[in-house]
UniProtKB/Swiss-Prot annotation:
Its EC number is 4.2.1.9. Homodimer. InterPro entries: Dihydro-acid_dehy_C (IPR042096), DihydroxyA_deHydtase (IPR004404), DiOHA_6PGluconate_deHydtase_CS (IPR020558), ILV_EDD_C (IPR056740), ILV_EDD_N (IPR000581), IlvD/EDD_N (IPR037237). Belongs to the IlvD/Edd family. One of its GO terms (cellular component) is cytosol. One of its GO terms (biological process) is isoleucine biosynthetic process. The gene is ilvD. The modification N6-carboxylysine is found at residue 124. Keywords: 2Fe-2S, Amino-acid biosynthesis, Branched-chain amino acid biosynthesis, Iron, Iron-sulfur, Lyase, Magnesium, Metal-binding. One of its GO terms (molecular function) is 2 iron, 2 sulfur cluster binding. Its cofactor is [2Fe-2S] cluster; Mg(2+). It is an enzyme of class 4 (lyase). This is Dihydroxy-acid dehydratase.
């Protein structure tokens, strides 16, 4: 029978000092012996996805204590990628994932906590907490802050839905008037919550459901909706049940590594491909798998990308559907239900509810259940009122979207495409692979060949695109922006956005060893591995070289002979693998990150071999 970790600090005369300090935090005599459960919050006033979380940690804490635990809350940092984007701040985004994972480990291990509730939401916070959960392997439940309502505005006598990316595109389009640009800016992000499309934050919150580590609705139920309060209440109650199952009943099925198994990671990846999730999720799933010693890598992702169809199309791949529409169609459970009916789900994997996915689908899939309570839950909708308050409205759709032929979520037979929403491409320019969000690629450019226009940084690329150096038919190459080369693997949302604003969104390709925002669409290929700074062939591309992209056949190649490539490599070895004449201030903290960073095909995690021996 495992011993409560917290007993180290709460039992024995030699722990009198620790107990004295616990008492000073409010622990009473009768509490010693109860499980100590960390409430890992991420409240900050910098991020709309986290601005409403301040009181939610204590909401969870009260439920933990009512159920027989001791709740202790702490906070992690949280970077807003949208605000950090387009300047030096973006260098810090991906490295913050490692800091979050480490800070959770530090706090939980330093104080011998027995279990965790992770209150996450935005881009690097959920992955960082997920990495920590797999690393620590103590009972955990995730509950996110929830998605933002979609923005709405009236243009040309039509009400259209909006999100952050619309504001960015319109702001950079010289043909759009200042008045219209400001109108869209003011309407794009109306409430608290993670940005309203299937961007990185919402993708990751959906994936925690598929991994089995969060409750139904976690990925899709709006931040503003009153129903979301119950997810926080239930998380506080369930974590005590999970904790006692493990420590008092020796039930190891309550541990995250026994919930988020390889089968669960494959379920999460199947969901990601089916819903056309952010390419960043590939990085984060690979990183979390390594933390949990799960045998899941790019080979698995490539295999699955060839099997799973695109069943759910959401912004930025369409303007028609946002996260509120996904929820109305049954949320993550609805998509997993269709994957199950297509034979593409490991339905015996378990979840934090203690159910197999087969059992959970029977209860929560709107296409199967008879429960009016469940159907009412999935009719939770937007109010259209600007607010930063959680649980502030109780609006509902009149009907569910159960149209699996032409609705937001579709059957395999009626899929948006039989080819999934993400693909792994390989070739001489990316021997270890690169990633493209096929859900956002127009069918006319699934095969594309063009001359390279090479930039050594995102800043130069932005200047070049806006300055007219890129024309229709070109392949924009942005290199030395990987985890080590950036450092920090910046998101390339501004270059892709400006290509659209210049009318080149369907006429150009972009290849980078950096990454993309979940808001990116178009023929945008990222994570080229190895990255240029690690000797990757993307560092050998010269201006005008032809690059051939073939998504259906999963290939990408530099049309240069092997002999020429070898000569260029020898030349680059002598010069050193670094950008030419790039002016960029890199802090000591970022240099420390770069010194241990691996390429994207490894999840951009730290190179553990550098700590051995």
């Amino acid at each position: 029978m495992p011993k409560y970790r917290s007993a180290t600090t709460t039992h024995g005369r030699n722990m009198a000092g620790a107990r004295a300090l616990w008492r000073a935090t409010g622990v009473k005599d009768e509490d010693f012996g109860k499980p100590i459960i960390a409430v890992v919050n991420s409240f900050t006033q910098f991020v709309p996805g986290h601005v409403h979380l301040k009181d939610l940690g204590q909401l969870v804490a009260r439920e933990i204590e009512a159920a027989g635990g001791i709740a202790k809350e702490f906070n992690t940092i949280a970077v807003d990628d949208g605000i950090a984007m387009g300047h030096g701040g973006m260098l810090y985004s991906l490295p913050s994932r490692e800091l979050i994972a480490d800070s959770v480990e530090y706090m939980v291990n330093a104080h011998c906590a027995d279990a965790m509730v992770c209150i996450s939401n935005c881009d690097k916070i959920t992955p960082g907490m997920l990495m920590a959960s797999m690393r620590l392997n103590i009972p955990v439940i995730f509950v996110s802050g929830g998605p933002m309502e979609a923005g709405k505005t009236k243009l040309s006598d039509q009400i259209i839905k909006l999100d952050l990316v619309d504001a960015m595109i319109q702001g950079a389009d010289p043909k759009v008037s200042d008045e219209q640009s400001e109108q869209i800016e003011r309407s794009a992000c109306p409430t608290c919550g993670s940005c309203s499309g299937m961007f990185t934050a919402n993708s990751m919150n959906c994936l925690t459901e598929a991994l089995g580590l969060s409750q139904p609705g976690n990925g899709s139920l709006l931040a503003t909706h009153a129903d979301r309060k119950q997810l926080f209440i239930s998380a506080g109650q369930r974590i005590v049940e999970l904790t006692k199952r493990y420590y008092e009943q020796d039930d190891e099925s309550a541990l995250p590594r026994n919930i988020a198994t390889k089968a669960a990671f494959e379920n999460a990846m199947a969901l990601d491909i089916a819903m056309g999730g952010s390419t960043n999720t590939v990085l984060h799933l690979l990183a979390a798998a390594q933390e949990g010693e799960v045998d899941f890598d790019m080979t698995d992702i490539d295999r699955m990308s060839r099997m799973v169809p695109h069943l759910c199309k959401v912004a930025p791949s369409t303007q028609k559907y946002h996260m509120e529409d996904v929820h109305r169609a049954g949320g993550v459970v609805g998509i997993l239900g269709e994957l199950n009916r297509a034979g593409l789900l490991h339905n015996q994997s378990k979840t934090v509810l203690g159910l197999t996915w087969e059992e959970q689908l029977a209860q929560y899939d709107i296409m199967l259940t008879d429960s009016e309570e469940v159907k009412r839950f999935y009719r939770a909708g937007p109010a259209g009122i600007r607010t930063t308050q959680a649980f502030s409205q109780d609006c509902r759709w009149d009907t569910l979207d159960d149209d699996r032929a032409q609705g937001c979520i579709r059957t395999k037979e009626n899929a948006f495409s039989q080819d999934g929403g993400l693909a792994v491409l390989k070739g001489n320019i990316a021997l270890d692979g690169c990633i493209v969000k096929t859900a956002g690629v127009d069918e006319s450019i699934l095969k594309f060949t063009g001359p390279a226009v090479v930039f050594e940084s995102q800043e130069d690329a932005v200047e070049g695109i806006l300055g007219g150096k890129v024309k229709a038919g070109d392949v924009v190459v942005i290199r030395y922006e990987g985890p080590k080369g950036g450092p920090g693997m910046q998101e390339m949302l501004y270059p892709t956005t400006y290509l659209k604003s210049m009318g080149l969104g369907k006429a150009c390709a972009l290849l980078t060893d950096g990454r993309f925002s979940g808001g990116t669409s178009g023929l945008s290929i990222g994570h080229a591995s190895p990255e240029a700074a690690n000797g990757g062939a993307i560092g050998l591309v010269k201006q005008g070289d032809l690059i051939a992209i073939d998504i259906p056949n999963r290939t990408i190649s530099l049309q240069v002979s092997d002999q020429e490539m070898a000569e260029r490599r020898a030349e680059q070895d002598a010069l050193g693998w670094k950008p030419v004449s790039r002016q960029r201030e890199v802090s000591f903290a970022l240099k420390a990150y770069a010194s241990m960073a691996t390429s994207a095909d490894k999840g951009a995690v730290r190179d553990k071999s550098k700590l051995e021996g």
